[in-house]
Amino acid sequence: MQFTTIVMTLAAAVAVTAYPGSSSAFGVGQDEHKHHSSDDHSATGASKGATCAVGSQVSCCTTDSSGSDVLGNVLGGSCLVDNLSLISILNSQCPGANTFCCPSNQDGTLNIHAACIPVAL
């Protein structure tokens, strides 16, 4: 019974945070990019549309979880948090639109990326 309650609470939290409206806490909304110049690049060298807000990082998933349900962002795919060396190796390209903005503040507890938001490059 407790396991079901925990899973349902986690699923509700993912449903609320994984699919925000046009503007989000991670800065991937269209309104955020209106004030930047056309040659704006993030710290990782990605293009203007691939920047994440302060406190979040670009993650690249190596397996496709786009067709999965709400828990696909938590359980599906194998995502790597972006580093400068990873982006230079991948040349800012992730397979099959599997790019996400994930929070970068890890507090040592169960660190699943439940709040990762898909972004288009």
Swiss-Prot record:
Disruption phenotype: Does not affect the ability of the fungus to grow in vitro on agar plates or in liquid culture. Does neither affect mycelium growth and sporulation, nor the frequency and speed of conidium germination. When the four class I hydrophobins (hcf-1 to -4) are partially silenced, approximately 10 times fewer conidia are produced an the germination efficiency of conidia is reduced by about 50%.
Induction (UniProt): Expression is increased during sporulation. Expression up-regulated by carbon or nitrogen starvation.
Role summary: Aerial growth, conidiation, and dispersal of filamentous fungi in the environment rely upon a capability of their secreting small amphipathic proteins called hydrophobins (HPBs) with low sequence identity. Class I can self-assemble into an outermost layer of rodlet bundles on aerial cell surfaces, conferring cellular hydrophobicity that supports fungal growth, development and dispersal; whereas Class II form highly ordered films at water-air interfaces through intermolecular interactions but contribute nothing to the rodlet structure.
Tissue expression notes: Expressed in conidia and aerial hyphae.
Subcellular localization, as worded in the UniProt entry: Secreted; Secreted, Cell wall
UniProt superkingdom: Eukaryota
Complex formation: Self-assembles to form functional amyloid fibrils called rodlets. Self-assembly into fibrillar rodlets occurs spontaneously at hydrophobic:hydrophilic interfaces and the rodlets further associate laterally to form amphipathic monolayers.
Keyword Glycoprotein: yes
Glycosylation sites: N83
Protein name in the entry: Class I hydrophobin 2
Signal peptide range: 1-18
Annotated disulfide bonds: C52-C101, C60-C94, C61-C79, C102-C116
Stated family: Belongs to the fungal hydrophobin family.
Keywords in alphabetical order: Cell wall, Disulfide bond, Glycoprotein, Secreted, Signal
Keyword Disulfide bond: yes
